[in-house]
């Protein structure tokens, strides 16, 4: 079984650096990393960063595609980029998977042979978040400061022609027959830290779509 860790990115240089270093350290030798950059919206700095991580054996690879405000079509490029993989774990550039999940992912998949999609809990934190923001966006924030926990994300999916991303915005996986959810444990969650400035920028962008 081969898992492809599929990173989608634009110009998030600091976040992408952090993610790629983490993945390179923790990805199993039997797996690979695929990086997809928005060909119309990435900086030279981001391109050069990604190129530094590429390996001759293709275990870390990169491609370009236009986002064109269509997130599902963009993410479906991963099926070609990771054509030699059995499973895909899609991760946004500003997220971090847990090393515990990565260490145990092969075992989890092997113990659930009929599952085609796994929902992953996500810990969202926003530095600078105020009560005014929370009320405005109608968010739920727990005592740890996690926004909308467990905020399950469909990110680990079988590479199959029947299973595709759909939806230009707030895209999701469809075509799967059986889905499973990871437990709501911090050790298994995606981590998604942001600043309030970044959150406001993204909200403004989504409002234009």
Named regions from a protein language model:
Residues 1-25:
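N-proximal low-complexity "stem/linker" segments adjacent to membrane-targeting elements
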Residues 3, 31, 86, 94, ...:
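Conserved acidic residues
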Residues 10, 38, 122:
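Histidine-centered beta-alpha loop that forms part of the nucleotide-sugar donor binding/catalytic region
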Residues 18-22, 48-49, 77, 103-107:
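A short acidic, amphipathic alpha-helical/loop segment
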Residues 21-64:
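Acidic donor-binding segment of Leloir-type glycosyltransferases
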Residues 64-71:
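Short, acidic/glycine-rich phosphate-metal binding loop used to engage nucleotide
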Residues 71-79, 87, 96-209:
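Catalytic-site signature of metal-activated, phosphate-bearing donor transferases
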């Amino acid at each position: 079984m081969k898992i492809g860790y599929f990173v989608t990115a634009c110009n998030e240089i600091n976040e992408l650096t952090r993610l790629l270093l983490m993945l390179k350290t923790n990805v199993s030798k039997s797996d690979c990393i695929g990086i997809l950059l928005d060909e119309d919206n990435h900086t030279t700095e981001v391109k050069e960063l990604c190129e530094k991580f590429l390996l001759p054996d293709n275990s870390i690879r990169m491609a370009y595609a236009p986002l064109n405000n269509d997130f599902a079509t963009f993410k479906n490029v991963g099926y070609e980029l990771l054509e030699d993989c059995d499973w895909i774990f899609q991760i946004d550039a500003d997220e971090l998977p847990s090393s515990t999940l990565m260490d145990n992912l092969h075992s989890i998949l092997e113990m659930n042979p009929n599952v085609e999609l796994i929902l992953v809990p996500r810990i969202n934190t926003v530095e600078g978040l105020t009560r005014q923001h929370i009320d405005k966006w109608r968010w739920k924030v727990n005592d740890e400061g996690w926004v909308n926990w467990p905020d399950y994300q469909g990110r680990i999916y079988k590479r199959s022609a029947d299973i595709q991303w759909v939806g230009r915005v707030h895209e999701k996986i469809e075509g799967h027959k059986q889905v499973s959810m990871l437990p709501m444990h911090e050790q298994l969650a995606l981590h998604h830290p942001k600043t309030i400035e970044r959150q406001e920028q993204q909200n403004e962008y989504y409002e234009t779509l």
